[in-house]
Amino acid sequence: MMNRSAFFVALLFAFFITGGQALAAQDSLFVPVGMSGNESATGIWWPEPVAKKAAKVSKSRIAKRDENLRAVREGASVVVWFHGGMSSGNCEKGFVAGADLAELYPEKIVVSISACRENHWVTRDMIDAVDAALDSVAAGRKAPVERVSLVGISDGTLGVLAYSVEGRRKVDDRLLMSSFGKFLGEPAVLASQKKMQSGRFRFLQGGKDRLYPSDQTVPWITDFCKVVSVDCELRFDPEGEHDWSYWKGKRMDWIREAIRK
């Protein structure tokens, strides 16, 4: 197994040979996975203040820049990305999985945790790992993280739903792409949970999803939205495919609308 030092070297090498397109996380860390003794590879992307060109960099300008940086980070909202393939053997997805989201929402703090093997999204330990990562954000910016928005793709959407019920933070917006909520049981039971009664839900579902057929997913989502007492909407694309690349390439407007500024 590759040790951590070797992994970070490989990660940086891959980043440079691709011209920086991977947008590797500014902070890469390992957070505890509940009481299991395991750790989850986590990436954090921080927003940056708009830089003004200066002929000379003085101490006062550096101090002002640092002050602006602190203010931007303290006031930024936080989005958690739940990647797909939650039971795969790749246990370091979190270091890069949130990169696209960070590009879409440069004004936000993006947090991406790694699920893998038995430490999948629908476990108490992984919910605790998400909160541990958010605790790290709070410590890093010296301001609490009280509310978050959640984005998931494929079985990452199970993490969105599970955190909504079990997580410590209040949830504002939820974006669930190519989901199969039936894995968690009856929609009415899940939708009636007390902690589901806040924020918004946006479901993006495709008619050409190769893994989750729309004749099974759409009725579940429809029933869920009928029961939950908050703003809940299904957006269906008959040509929609399963993968993130489709939604990013074809339905960017839906994605941007789902997570409010």
Question: Which residues are covered by each model-predicted region?
Answer:
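A domain-start/cap signature at the N-terminus of enzymes
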Residues: 22-78, 124, 153-155, 162, ...
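Bacterial N-terminal signal peptides
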Residues: 9-19
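Primarily recognizes the serine-hydrolase "nucleophile elbow" in alpha/beta-hydrolase
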Residues: 140, 146-195
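Cell-envelope and extracellular/periplasmic
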Residues: 81-87, 138-141, 153, 160, ...
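Short substrate-entry loop that stabilizes the transition state in hydrolases
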Residues: 72-76, 81-121, 183
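C-terminal catalytic histidine-bearing segment of alpha/beta-hydrolase fold enzymes
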Residues: 84, 202-204, 210-261
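Short, proline-enriched alpha-helix->beta-strand connector loops that line the catalytic pocket
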Residues: 195-201
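Alpha/beta-hydrolase active-site loop
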Residues: 121-141
